[in-house]
Amino acid sequence: MTQPIKLLVGLANPGPEYAKTRHNAGAWVVEELARVHNVTLKNEPKFFGLTGRIMVNGQDLRLLIPTTFMNLSGKAIAALAKFYQIKPEEIMVAHDELDLPPGVAKFKKGGGHGGHNGLRDTISKLGNNKDFYRLRIGIGHPGHKDKVAGFVLGKAPAKEQELLDAAADEAVRSLDILIKDGLSKAQNRLHTFKAE
């Protein structure tokens, strides 16, 4: 059996002006999971974020959306993980992924940061440990690296947003499978999904 996941983090920038930007795609998953489980995320200053707690398949799962800026996300994750004695390999971080198209989401265990500042800070604050799970929500790529900053901080057009929402919803459903049956079964489900 794979290591149980005890903390799901949705990476985001704080404030209403960023709420619907592509860079906040990870947070949408946590918000949707909280909604499905009828839990209100509460601001918790000592964890530098919005937190909640749900039960998935009989397992306790803490939710966190850091309210730091993206490049300081690790501070919130490390604070909560330390307090509840959650190991890096019991953490899943949901984030926007330039290398996947909108409508696609994938689970992954371990790996580098791929230039994502939220992941970079998380790895650093977890003592350079890269063993946490990732939930990659595809947002597509603007085509040129110079356009990336504007792209991730921009809002998706309506049709594209539908694809992003559908992938986030499917990721939430697949998370149940991951917690119950492990990573490979969850990957089989999520990785065959593509919103059209």
Curated annotation (Swiss-Prot):
The active site is at 23 (proton acceptor). The record marks 13 as: Discriminates between blocked and unblocked aminoacyl-tRNA. GO terms for biological process: protein quality control for misfolded or incompletely synthesized proteins; rescue of stalled ribosome. Its EC number is 3.1.1.29. Keywords: Cytoplasm, Hydrolase, RNA-binding, tRNA-binding. It catalyses: an N-acyl-L-alpha-aminoacyl-tRNA + H2O = an N-acyl-L-amino acid + a tRNA + H(+). The keyword tRNA-binding applies. TRNA binds at residues 18, 69, 71, 117. GO terms for molecular function: peptidyl-tRNA hydrolase activity; tRNA binding. It is found in: Cytoplasm. One of its GO terms (cellular component) is cytoplasm. The record marks 96 as: Stabilizes the basic form of H active site to accept a proton. Monomer. Hydrolyzes ribosome-free peptidyl-tRNAs (with 1 or more amino acids incorporated), which drop off the ribosome during protein synthesis, or as a result of ribosome stalling. Belongs to the PTH family. This is Peptidyl-tRNA hydrolase. It comes from Vibrio parahaemolyticus serotype O3:K6 (strain RIMD 2210633). The gene is pth.
